[in-house]
Regions:
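A domain-level signal for the structural core that forms small-molecule/cofactor-binding pockets
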Residues: 1-74
């Protein structure tokens, strides 16, 4: 899948979870959603994007970037 599509999907997921009152729990839940519902190759691709792209240059919103960086398992 194209990375731009994964970015759009991840940002959509983040837009739901960002409204949670506990930001750390929201990030865990957003990453958990990706972990549960995305295939291994999709998870690997978005994780590589986060690892290879400085946050300031990322097309992911800050919340999603941090959720993936901090909580998404390989």
């Amino acid at each position: 899948m194209e990375t731009k599509n994964l970015i759009r999907m991840a940002n959509d997921i983040g837009s739901f979870f960002v409204s949670y009152p506990d930001e750390e729990q929201a990030k865990r839940d957003a990453a958990g959603h990706i972990q549960k519902f995305w295939g291994r190759d999709m998870r690997k691709q978005i994780k590589e994007y986060v690892n290879d792209t400085p946050e300031k240059n990322s097309q992911l919103n800050t919340f999603v970037f941090n959720a993936i960086n901090e909580y998404l398992k390989d």
